[in-house]
Every structure is written in C-alpha cells, then in structure tokens.
Amino acid sequence: MNVTTAGDLGDLIFVLSILSELDNGPHTLILRDNGRTHGIEKHFKSLHKLVTSQPYIKSFELFNGQRIDWASEDFRTRARAEPRSLLDSHWAHGKRVLNSAQDIRGDKAWLHVTPDKAFNGRVILARSHRYRNDFFPWVEVVKEFRDRAVFVGIDAEHTEFCNLFGYVPCVEFSDFYKLAAAIAGSDLFVGNQSFSNALNEGLKHNSIQEVSHQFPDCLYNRPNAQYCFDGRLRLPSRNLPCLIVDPSKIQTNARLPGGWEYDGVTAPTFRGLFAALSDHQVRVTEEQVLRHTAQSRCGLFYKYAAKDWLPRLVAYAEKAGVNLDIPDVSSYT
C-alpha cells in the first residue's frame, strides 16, 4: 500500500504506528509537501534511516506522481471522530478511506532502533515552541536531573529553555535515527508534545510529558509514562504538588484512554483555567496569565494571536462571570 504524509514530523511518526499494524504490509511511505503544514520533504534524508529500518516499511520515497492509496494528511480536513490521540485522528480518517475494520491504537512500540549506550544514565529534555503548559515544573526538573540532563532541539528552543529554566548542554544529531537511538539509550525522556516526544512514544520509553491544555492529544495509558498538566509530578527525590489550590476547577476529563474535548474556549479545560486564574489560585505571573489566555489554537503566543484571541477570550470570561484581571487588553496588541 502507498501512503503519503505531508507532516508535520510528529504526524509521520504516528502514521508509522498505523503502518506497523496495518494489514497487507510491508507498505510504502511517501513524503509530499502540500502547503498546509511546515513542509516535510526537506527532512527526507534525516528521516531515511529511521523509516527504512522499520520492518513494516517496503520503501520510503518522495512524491513523484505515484499511486496513492491513503493520503494520511487529509485527516486535517475532516472532523475528528472523538479521538483519544493524534494517532486516533489519523486512523479515524484512514479507516474511512481504506474501508478497514482494523482497530489500531498504538499500544505497542513501533519504532525499532539500537539504543545508543553513550546515553545510558542520561535524561533527555525537549521543549518545542508549541503545545506548552506553564504549570509544568521545569525549574524543578532541571534541578533534579541537571548533572545528567541533555537538551535536544533547535538552537532557538535550547537558548530559550536555558534562559527560562537554567543551563543544560545541547546535543545535536545528524539524522533522526540517531536521535531515536539516544532516547532509547537514555534513562528518561522529559518533554512537551514535540517531534522528540513522538519518537519517545514510538519507542514506549520512560517519559514525563508536559501536557498541553489546548490540544492534549498525545496521551497513552502506559505504566512508564507520567502526564503532567497541573504541576503534580513524581521525581526520584520527591513528589511535586499541584500548583492549583482547587484541582477540581480544571475539568480535563483525563480518563485514559479518551474523554478529551477539542472545543476551544467552550471546553471544560478553558472554563476551569479561567476560574483558577481569576481566583488567584495559581502561582503564575501576569505574563503567564497572558500566555494562557492569549494562546492561539496551535498553542503558540504571537502578536496576531493576542489581537484575535485575547479579546474573544476576555469577552467569554466576562460573559461567564469570570474576571481575568487584565486591565487593558489593547496594551497586548
């Protein structure tokens, strides 16, 4: 079967999960850019060894007019069918296109690499610019693992991370197979919903995830993973407390698997967040309040997001009787 993906990179990793279980394999995976995502063809060389090393892959190619049996990237144009995860969003679309009755959940490891022993004992940290959670206790994580932590990601991510949470060295890799091998060889992966996190999930490696309140769609019920959305975390030396005095006010519906909503400002996650912030129950700065209330649908805080989303969120909060205590919305636009 010929399957295309236009990315992002994390999408490709979860498509691999589906191909690892899909009948009538091995399959051909084809990259093509479609203008809706960040462009994935440029990563072909970096992905090649990782993808072709998987036993369920027959061939890995760039698009050049080949027959396409399933354009997996088209999941973005369809309504999500109550997914538990990003993988479920892909497969809900794939089942319809392929007229398949298979139940694919990504419960087992689907990435197979040789662990890099050079990273034995290491803790790998990653934090991309999207899908963040300001309740995640990064400062405490860095303190806990500083002597053996390394950061993976682009230069801008590393610089920002060190400025915010303290210095940790950054490691670069010539291809994504080597990155996956480093994660597999490490003791633990800690990160947000990034490409590195997708690799870690494909390996089913020990992990702590910084869960996005806006798009919590990378949750998998396994015993060696922690999902932190309110500051609570189990570290080797101690347990960190919830940063919200009344956790019941954030209604995440975090029963695994399933139950998450994708309804923007009408979701219980947003309503609970408004209440917690307005009641001053959360130990956050004014800047963090702004970031939470002005995040765009993609989880990024940009000027255009403030212009569009902040006034709408404030209006929603006022209608709900919640005071966000932001004196002048125009000052942020």
Question: What are the residue ranges of the model-derived segments?
Answer:
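Catalytic machinery of carbohydrate-active enzymes
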Residues: 1-333
